[in-house]
Regions:
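Active-site neighborhoods and metal-handling regions in enzymes and metal-associated proteins
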Residues: 1-217
């Protein structure tokens, strides 16, 4: 598709930032240890992780590469031991590089293909069949690397919210509920139908939500 798609939009270049521990509830290093234990139990040497929300959760990082979703365009490879290999444009993580390098080895985005090719034919690589591009499978097969199709190991741990995450979700709903209440009052008692349309109403609600300290969009 890239060969024939003219006038493609520019590749997103947002800057990554750390999702603070006071909101995450668990350090990235600790999450990595847990995932690596699950890889060891299934005899997987490396796991190719392409799910952006899983990478964001695992490393406690966020970005703004996708509208309305705080994600960073990147890939990750989780080894059974040691630092996670993160493939992302260097300028995106420059401001948080020192923090990340405590548990991450950063690489250029495109170098993931070369990295996989050099893993070694005696290694077992895990990947989620539903989430991983065929190109990664092809590289593994061409390099005589054994593939073990395994569901994304971050999915269930990410779904099991810790107490800080649960508290954050509840507080977010309380804040948003206050915005909705103000909006409904405005809709019923103040709004003039002749001067308002759906877009103006949506903008009014958005501005109410923006009044809260932790609003992000």
């Amino acid at each position: 598709i890239d060969k024939y798609w003219e006038n493609q939009p520019f590749y997103p270049q947002s800057k990554a930032f750390i999702h603070d521990l006071k909101y995450a509830g668990k350090a990235g290093r600790d999450k990595i240890y847990d995932i690596q234990e699950s890889l060891a139990a299934t005899f997987i040497d490396y796991y190719i992780l392409t799910s952006l929300d899983s990478i964001a959760w695992l490393l406690n990082i966020r970005g703004n590469d996708i509208d309305y979703t705080p994600l960073l365009c990147c890939f990750a490879i989780i080894p059974q031991k040691g630092n996670v290999e993160l493939f992302v444009e260097e300028k995106k993580i420059r401001s948080i590089k020192n923090e990340l390098e405590k548990f991450v080895n950063p690489h250029s985005f495109e170098s993931i293909y070369e990295f996989i090719g050099k893993i070694g034919k005696d290694k077992i690589v895990g990947m989620d069949k539903k989430q991983t591009a065929y190109n990664f499978k092809k590289i593994c097969l061409n390099s005589n690397i054994t593939i073990n199709y395994l569901s994304n190991p971050c999915t269930y741990p990410k779904a099991q919210k810790n107490e800080i995450e649960l508290s954050g979700a509840r507080n977010a709903n309380i804040r948003d509920g206050a915005s909705i209440t103000k909006f409904l009052y405005w809709l019923k008692n103040i709004m003039k139908i002749s001067e308002t349309n759906e877009i103006k109403a949506a903008d009014y609600l958005l501005n109410l939500r923006k009044e809260h300290e932790l609003f992000y969009s």
